[in-house]
């Protein structure tokens, strides 16, 4: 399942998840693209301390970017 497709449907796939608006899905997709382009996210399958350090050094609101990566990793399971 593609990342954007997962984001649009994750509320149906996982209990307790809320439906995302289309604009939010686009924002998550853009965040992921930018993190990959800048070499912050390198395709890791787990979020470790090193990745969190790279995120916190680059982004003030780094937890939003961490959530983006978590959603991306989760999408690989569908």
Model-assigned labels for residue ranges:
Residues 8-16:
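Positively charged, polyanion-binding regions of nucleic-acid-associated proteins
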Residues 17-78:
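Non-catalytic DNA-binding core/recognition domains of DNA-processing enzymes
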Residues 1-8, 74-78:
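N-terminal DNA-binding module of tyrosine recombinases/phage integrases
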């Amino acid at each position: 399942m593609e990342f954007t497709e997962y984001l649009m449907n994750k509320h149906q796939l996982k209990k307790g998840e809320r439906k995302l608006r289309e604009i939010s899905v686009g924002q998550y997709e853009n965040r992921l693209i930018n993190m990959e382009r800048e070499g912050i996210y390198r395709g890791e399958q787990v979020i470790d301390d090193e990745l969190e350090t790279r995120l916190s050094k680059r982004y003030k609101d780094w937890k939003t970017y961490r959530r983006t990566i978590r959603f991306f990793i989760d999408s690989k399971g569908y």
